[in-house]
């Protein structure tokens, strides 16, 4: 599956995570937990059986630009905001920080390579259950 240009392997519609298998950075290749709150949306998309997790109505690849122009801007106009999709990462990190999620888990979830120490990058191993517990705190 592809998630707006991020190649990933979805581990069946009953799993609450996916694996990013191609990324711009090494830390981008990771397990991404799917929060219980958003799982029904991912399950619906996955169960559509399309090659792409997020896709156009006719099943084609959804580029970032296409998504942004076709959906994001109209939603932002509707609710009177001027946020960019990347702002959701900031919000997610802020919400997890407010819920006192371990900073290493936050970095692993968002794939933030620059802020990780050598210890975090190389020696800190976390499992999917820990990532799910962290994301579900928000």
For the regions a protein language model found, what residue spans apply to each?
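Short clusters of hydrophobic/aromatic residues that line enzyme substrate/ligand-binding pockets
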Residues: 20, 54, 123, 138
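Catalytic-site neighborhood detector that most strongly recognizes the C-terminal catalytic loop/helix
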Residues: 39, 110-137
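Short, basic (Lys/Arg/His-rich) helix/loop patches that form interaction surfaces
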Residues: 32, 47-53, 57-62, 69-116
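Extended glycan-interaction surfaces of carbohydrate-active proteins
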Residues: 40-41, 51
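Generic alpha-helical segment signature
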Residues: 64-65, 131
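Basic, Lys/Arg-rich DNA-contacting stretches centered on the C-terminal catalytic core
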Residues: 1-38, 56-58
